[in-house]
């Protein structure tokens, strides 16, 4: 069973890997295949589960390492509202992640 903190870690790995890969299209030797697989899983499976585009943007910006003030400004919310949306979205994604992993075993 994953926690929201674990899911946030998956998103962080995906965002950082995506930044490294998008610079020139090739896979640098220091990027692990597991990180690329995590990025693909997050982008292809978890991100589409976030129906609210603003919530999706908040999660992705925060995963890239932006501070709450920058995230809030980018999406037009206060910092506390952005944090609330982020936490709520991670809880929802955690439930989805745990459901798909239980059904696979």
What are these regions (language model features)?
Residues 50-66:
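Short amphipathic alpha helix immediately N-terminal
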């Amino acid at each position: 069973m994953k926690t929201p903190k674990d899911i946030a870690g998956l998103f962080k790995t995906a965002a950082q890997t995506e930044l490294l890969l998008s610079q020139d299209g090739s896979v640098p030797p220091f990027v692990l295949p597991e990180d690329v697989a995590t990025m693909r899983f997050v982008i292809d499976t978890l991100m589409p589960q976030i129906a609210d585009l603003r919530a999706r943007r908040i999660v992705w910006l925060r995963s890239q390492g932006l501070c709450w003030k920058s995230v809030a400004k980018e999406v037009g919310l206060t910092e506390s509202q952005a944090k609330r949306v982020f936490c709520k979205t991670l809880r929802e994604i955690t439930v989805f992640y745990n459901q798909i992993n239980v059904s696979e075993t």
